[in-house]
Amino acid sequence: MLVYLLPGSFDTREAHLDLLWEAGATGLEERGPNIRVYFDERTELPAEVADGEWHEEAEQDWQAEFKKNLRPVHAGRVTIVAPWQREEVPAGQLALVIEPGMAFGTGHHATTRMAVEALGELDLSGKRVLDVGTGSGVLAMAAAKLGAAQTLGVDIDPITIPIARDNARDNGLTSGIRFEEGTLGLDEDAEMFGEPYDVLVANLYAELHDLLAGEYAAQLRPGAPLILTGILTSKLPLVRDALDREGFTDVQVRTDSEGAGGEWALVTARRED
């Protein structure tokens, strides 16, 4: 069995995980100080993930090991599980089923979990929610499960859109939710957004939040909440300055309390009335 040992964790190497899948990885597993990346054959890897080591190991059922070690993610009122974990959702919790290894947003990263928790703290009944950078659609689907009447997930990566639509169907979400390729601030994409939203959530990196802060304000009705994550704590000043520049109020910060030393942050704010 061919294994590539990459130093770090899913949290610290989050930005590089898609590169491994694109290079032909057949599975990823966090174990000790490394991410174990399984391949069928040795392949040339991008420079960003070239600091690991190749190993030949005795054959084992890594898929069985992966399934055994994967745990449900409890995010407020929502529990995110893999398809084989449906029976592990506690009574009273909303189940959100995501296949691990799909587009970004399986729920196992701290930023996704914090965003789902923040959505669960809002009354979304009858609300319109916009998810920017939707990836697998996990945040849009969480909003729909939590009662949103209309949810739109947008992403500039066309590969993610059919994946998000499939995930929604697999979760029984067939109306009131849609996914479209596009982004904020482009004239050709303006029509897809419609009227201002009651909630906007975005799991992107800090520099994009800085760039898009004005568009966030334009897409929200006055007084509506904004939820931003994907932010390294070291980048919080950049995001705070952007929100202040665009007139957002009630800016609050929370950091990840589980693993990774609290290096990830979530910021909530409200559009100025």
Curated annotation (Swiss-Prot):
Mention one GO molecular function.
Answer: protein methyltransferase activity
Q: Which reaction does it catalyse?
A: L-lysyl-[protein] + 3 S-adenosyl-L-methionine = N(6),N(6),N(6)-trimethyl-L-lysyl-[protein] + 3 S-adenosyl-L-homocysteine + 3 H(+)
SUPFAM superfamilies to which the protein is assigned, alphabetical: S-adenosyl-L-methionine-dependent methyltransferases (SSF53335)
**What does the record give as EC number?**
2.1.1.-
List the subcellular locations.
Cytoplasm
- The species this protein belongs to is Deinococcus radiodurans (strain ATCC 13939 / DSM 20539 / JCM 16871 / CCUG 27074 / LMG 4051 / NBRC 15346 / NCIMB 9279 / VKM B-1422 / R1)
Assigned keywords, A-Z: Cytoplasm, Methyltransferase, S-adenosyl-L-methionine, Transferase
What PANTHER family does UniProt report for this protein, alphabetically? ELECTRON TRANSFER FLAVOPROTEIN BETA SUBUNIT LYSINE METHYLTRANSFERASE (PTHR43648:SF1)
For binding S-adenosyl-L-methionine, which residues are annotated in this chain's numbering? 112, 133, 155, 203
Gene Ontology biological process terms, A to Z? methylation
Family label: Belongs to the methyltransferase superfamily. PrmA family.
What biological function has been recorded for the protein in this entry?
Methylates ribosomal protein L11.
Looking at the UniProt record for this protein, which Gene Ontology cellular component terms does it annotate, in alphabetical order?
A: cytoplasm
Query: What's this protein's name?
Result: Ribosomal protein L11 methyltransferase
